[in-house]
Amino acid sequence: ISSHAGISPHLGRSALDAVTLFNVGIQFLREHVLPSVRMHYAVTDTGGFSPNVVQPTAEVLVLLRAEDNATVADVRSRVEDIARGAALMTGTELEIDFVKATSNTVPNHVLGRDAVENLKLLKLPEFSKEDVEFYSKISATNKNGNPGHPIADTIPDFKPVEIVFPASSDVGDVSWIVPTVSLSAPTWPVGTAAHSWQAVAVGKSTPAHKATLMVGEAMAGVAVDLIEKPELLEQAKEELNRRLKGSKYECPIPKGVVPRALSMKK
């Protein structure tokens, strides 16, 4: 409810206060979830730019991550309770709008090992002096960079790990249904952070294209192996079934939620 913040603040009900209290609640929740849980948020609407007005509307966008779908669902329930509590404390109304969701990625060591073997069969890309100089300049702008050796030029041995890279992708949903493997290549200078301007600056560079083509060849090699070696495919399927332990894929997106641009409100 909008009102004049100086003359009649008692008549207003601040949605911005509710969002602020909600965000504070998120901070306290961090102490009581698993260390692998990630809770991100961005205030996308503060209700306006006039401080002398009780803000009648406000909006916050929340992104939750965890190692598995069940944990995300549990944290989501608690986050929604915090939102309801914030609305109750401020006398405001609440609307929860579900935007998107993806599933956790199920690792597959059978395919991972085969993918690395295919990488090792390939010749490493040859980078020109200009390529190295460009990557070195970009790397020098990053405190974690290595301007003297900006391009990774080795292929490490396969190392089975259970921790999946904590970025969100709908590849995770695919991995619940069929054995799945992903490969990464040095398309960024050593030490580059994702979503940084340095990552954007090299996205269309020659070294990035060369590394991408190499990974494409390795992935094609995995596909050929699966066609020519039925036993490899069966081993990958067996591993997937073992990891799922009888669990069936359930889409984490509720029924009725349709794709849309984030800028479009429900």
Question: Model-flagged regions — what are they?
Answer:
Residues 85, 96-97, 207, 219, ...:
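Short, intrinsically disordered/low-complexity patches at protein termini
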Residues 1-142:
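Midchain, well-structured core segments that form catalytic/ion-binding scaffolds
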Residues 132-216, 234-265:
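Zn-dependent metallopeptidase/amidohydrolase metal-coordination segment
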Residues 88, 120-124, 176-179, 186, ...:
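Hydrophobic alpha-helix feature that most strongly marks membrane-spanning transmembrane helices
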Residues 17-20, 24-32, 68-81, 188-242:
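His/Asp/Glu-rich mid-to-C-terminal helical/loop segments that flank catalytic regions of hydrolases
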Residues 115, 174, 219:
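Hydrophobic, well-ordered secondary-structure elements that form the walls
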Residues 108, 128-129, 205, 229, ...:
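Helix N-terminus capping/helix-initiation residues
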